[in-house]
């Protein structure tokens, strides 16, 4: 199981709420028809697509399209509309994935670790994992010195962190919509 927590690479004036991921036993998949799937696919490609253009492309009335999108939001299928900020454009061209393992004695501090680490400006996403690693952090930094400082000051200096492993990202390609 992977739980994703968004970091603070986005506009600091907007508070992003953390969602607690439910297990597959807790959630029944929403009933989606082909129109819903086309709407989701189009919004995945461009979340700013105007409702009239979305309705026209899908072949339904704008009022029907608006109602469909609202229903998908209400059902939790659409969890939000986000700005995808290019780290390079804001001076953070080096990206990495950092695997983090906590000390076994720190298991009760998982939530506080998440809240503390996701506030760091370099952290784009936090993945809470089941498996060999406890977390994977997706981070962006100015350069290797900035990345090293982040790891040393925020992870290695934390007594609750047992170890880390850093992998540099050469290229990030967005996947297809999961529909």
From Swiss-Prot:
Coiled coil segments of this chain: none
DNA-binding region ranges: 51-70
GO cellular component terms, semicolon-separated: cytosol
Matching Gene3D superfamilies: 3.30.70.920, Winged helix-like DNA-binding domain superfamily/Winged helix DNA-binding domain
InterPro entries assigned: ArsR-like_HTH (IPR011991), AsnC-type_HTH_dom (IPR000485), Dimeric_a/b-barrel (IPR011008), Tscrpt_reg_AsnC-like (IPR019888), Tscrpt_reg_AsnC/Lrp_C (IPR019887), WH-like_DNA-bd_sf (IPR036388), WH_DNA-bd_sf (IPR036390)
Activity regulation: The DNA-binding activity of AldR is modulated by interaction of AldR with various amino acids. Alanine, tryptophan, tyrosine and aspartate completely abolish the DNA binding ability of AldR. On the other hand, glutamate and asparagine reduce AldR binding to DNA but do not completely abolish it. Binding of amino acids can lead to structural modifications and changes in oligomeric association. Activity is also inhibited by 3 small molecule inhibitors, tetrahydroquinoline carbonitrile derivative (S010-0261), levothyroxine and liothyronine, which can disrupt the AldR-DNA complex.
Limits of the HTH asnC-type domain: 32-93
One of the protein's GO biological processes: response to amino acid
GO terms of molecular function: sequence-specific DNA binding
Pfam families: AsnC_trans_reg, HTH_24
Keywords: Activator, DNA-binding, Repressor, Transcription, Transcription regulation
Residues that span the membrane, as ranges: none
Free-text note on domains in this protein's UniProt record: Contains an N-terminal DNA-binding domain, followed by a rather long linker and a C-terminal effector-binding domain, which is also involved in oligomeric interactions.
Subunit structure: Homooctamer. Homotetramer. Tetramer of dimers. The N-terminal DNA-binding domains are swapped, forming a dimer, and four dimers are assembled into an octamer through crystal symmetry.
Job of this protein: Transcriptional regulator that might play a role under hypoxic conditions. Regulates the expression of ald, which encodes L-alanine dehydrogenase. Serves as both an activator for ald expression in the presence of L-alanine and a repressor in the absence of L-alanine. Acts by binding directly to the upstream region of the ald gene. Four AldR-binding sites (O2, O1, O4 and O3) were identified upstream of the ald gene.
Protein known as: HTH-type transcriptional regulator AldR
